[in-house]
Amino acid sequence: MALHPELELDISVNDQHADLVKYNIDIAIRAAHLEDLNLKAKKLIEHSLCYFASPDYLAENGTPQNQSQLSTHKCITYSLMHPSNVWTFEASKVQVNEVIKSDSPDMIVKMARSGAGIAAMPKWMVAEYFENCELVEILPQKHAFSLPMYAVYKNSNHIPDKISAFIKFLSDYFTKNK
């Protein structure tokens, strides 16, 4: 905002795929493999999921040593992934024991921090909790599912300056904070 004080932001935080044209949305951030060919997109980051739990959960339930052991643990899943109870690793998919599911990444992290089970999220979303030991990464040696994150915007011949400026800000931010 300091770079462009004239900009006004109206931010909606949800994980639903809103129709940009129908709702007159300038930019959406999508963590997905894109399917809508009617939108333009700027790739911001490629993020890998990591798997984690609280120290208390692991002390009580043990730490899984491989992906197949996830089926015997309580797992907190993201309900907007389909199917939500299948976690993808580089070379395999594992059906997990889904005890809680939510469409809120924030809620998933909070539940994991409270000891409710094992969860999966992009590493950048939980790195601070690894640093302060509120969460412990499990299976770090396994190659987790990787997902691109894009800034998507309406397909038109002219991109307004405010959209270009915001996309540049996002791109610079994620380049600096990988």
Which sequence ranges carry the predicted segments?
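Solvent-exposed beta-strand sheet faces enriched in polar/charged residues
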Residues: 10-14, 138, 152
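Central regulatory/effector-binding core of bacterial HTH transcription factors
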Residues: 1-37
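A late-sequence structural motif
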Residues: 139-178
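C-terminal regulatory
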Residues: 34-146, 176-177
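Conserved amphipathic alpha-helical interaction elements at protein-protein interfaces in regulatory
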Residues: 2-6, 132, 172, 176
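A cross-family signal for key residues in well-ordered alpha-helices
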Residues: 29, 109, 127, 153, ...
